[in-house]
C-alpha cells in the first residue's frame, strides 16, 4: 500500500498539490504514522470507530510520539477522527486521491465496502485518477475466497481496473491479508 501511495504522492507533488488520503480504520495507526513521517505532502484523515483503539495507539504504539516529532497533527497533515468510517465517507463532499480501507471486525472487512453500494460510494469520493486500496482477509481461490470474490465483483462493476496483491501467492487457498487495488 505504501508503495502505491508514495508514487501517487510524488505525482501530486509534481503538480504542486497535496495528496488527499482517507484511511478507514486506524487500528495501530501504522499507515498514518508512515504517511506523517515520510510523505510530507499528504493530507490524511484517519477514521477509527473505537476511541479505545486510538487511545491505545497513542499510548502504546507511539502515535503521540510520531505526531510530536512530525508536527503532522498540528499542521493539519494528519487528522484523527473517531467515527464510523462508512458513515463518515457517505457524509463527505471531499474527493480523495487515495481511499484506504483498513477497517476490520475480526477477520471481516467493513461490511458495506464489499457491496455494489460500497463500490459506488467509494468511486463517487475518488478524484480523477484516484485509487482505492483495501486489506481483504480472504483466500484468493477455493472455498474460503468468497469475501475477495464479492469485493472483486462489486468493484469490478464500478472501476476500470481491479487487481489483487496476494499475501500467499504460492498458496492461493490459504486465507491471507491481500491488498485489493481499484482504479
Predicted regions and their residues:
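Flexible, glycine-/basic-rich loop-and-beta segments that form/coincide
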Residues: 183
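The AdoMet/dcAdoMet-binding core of the Class I SAM-like
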Residues: 1-133, 139-152, 156-158, 170-175, ...
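Short secondary-structure junctions
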Residues: 160-165
Amino acid at each position: 500500500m505504501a508503495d502505491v501511495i508514495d508514487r501517487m504522492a510524488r505525482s501530486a507533488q509534481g503538480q504542486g498539490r497535496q495528496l488527499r488520503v482517507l484511511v478507514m480504520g486506524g487500528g495501530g495507526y501504522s499507515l498514518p504514522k508512515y504517511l506523517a513521517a515520510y510523505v510530507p505532502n499528504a493530507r490524511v484523515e484517519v477514521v477509527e470507530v473505537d476511541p479505545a483503539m486510538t487511545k491505545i495507539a497513542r499510548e502504546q504504539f507511539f502515535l503521540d510520539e510520531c505526531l510530536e516529532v512530525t508536527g503532522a497533527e498540528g499542521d493539519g497533515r494528519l487528522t484523527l477522527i473517531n467515527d464510523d468510517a462508512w458513515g463518515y465517507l457517505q457524509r463527505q463532499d471531499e474527493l480523495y486521491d487515495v481511499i484506504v480501507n483498513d477497517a476490520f471486525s475480526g477477520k471481516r472487512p467493513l461490511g458495506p465496502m464489499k457491496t455494489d453500494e460500497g463500490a459506488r460510494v467509494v468511486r463517487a469520493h475518488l478524484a480523477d485518477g484516484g485509487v482505492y486500496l483495501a486489506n481483504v482477509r480472504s483466500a484468493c481461490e477455493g472455498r474460503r475466497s468468497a469475501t475477495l470474490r464479492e469485493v472483486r465483483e462489486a468493484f469490478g462493476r464500478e472501476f476500470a481496473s481491479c487487481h489483487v496483491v496476494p499475501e500467499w501467492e504460492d498458496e492461493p487457498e490459504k486465507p491471507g491479508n491481500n491488498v485489493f487495488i481499484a482504479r
